[in-house]
From Swiss-Prot:
Binds ribosomal protein uS19. Keywords: Chaperone, Cytoplasm, Ribosome biogenesis, rRNA processing. Belongs to the RimM family. It comes from the Bacteria. An accessory protein needed during the final step in the assembly of 30S ribosomal subunit, possibly for assembly of the head region. Essential for efficient processing of 16S rRNA. May be needed both before and after RbfA during the maturation of 16S rRNA. It has affinity for free ribosomal 30S subunits but not for 70S ribosomes. Its main location: cytoplasm. This is Ribosome maturation factor RimM.
Length: 171
């Protein structure tokens, strides 16, 4: 059975020429939405997948704007609003050492180098120079950890465990 990964959500149309507005959940939008790539639009239940070929991609504000082959006006893409864009596992490329897919990191437990449990990574933000991992703590507010070498010491995907160095002012 094919394992599917969510790479974005279609939140609206854009203009009248069949462009859709996507909130991306992918690590590499420029690669994922490359012209000619096949993506799959899933229904709400995740039981049907409509293959679509990307004909254009551009970024606009915080959204990715896409058009698909054979869908040339707003009326044809209106039905996709609220749908998820997915890719099968075999479309996930190999990453360099020290690089991870979001789905591999989200859900990992986070501990300090002293072994103190801090919580679980629930989200990854990309505000600029480096990603920021949002850690849900058992009690209190979420913790924001920059994904930099000085802080993130070890990532063990198999055990879903991340070890960090707590810099002054981080907690």
């Amino acid at each position: 059975m094919t394992k599917w990964f969510n790479v974005g959500k279609i939140v609206n149309t854009h203009g009248v020429r069949g462009e859709i507005r996507v909130i991306s959940r992918t690590d590499f939008p420029e690669e994922r939405y490359k012209v000619g790539n096949t993506l799959y639009i899933s229904n709400e239940k995740g039981t049907d997948y409509l293959p679509v070929k990307v004909t254009s991609h551009r970024q606009h504000k915080t959204f990715d704007l896409l058009t698909f082959e054979g869908y040339n006006n707003v009326d044809e893409v209106e039905k996709f609003k609220g749908s998820l864009i997915k890719v099968p596992e075999e479309q996930l490329g190999e990453l360099a050492e020290g690089e991870y897919y979001y789905h591999e990191i989200i859900g990992c437990s986070v501990v300090t180098e002293e072994g103190e449990a801090l919580g679980t990574i629930k989200e990854i933000l990309s505000p600029g120079a480096n990603d920021v991992w949002v850690i849900k703590r058992p009690k209190g507010q979420d913790l924001l950890i920059p994904y930099i070498d000085d802080v993130v010491l070890q990532v063990n995907i198999e055990n879903k465990l991340v070890t960090i160095h707590v810099m002054e002012g981080l907690l």
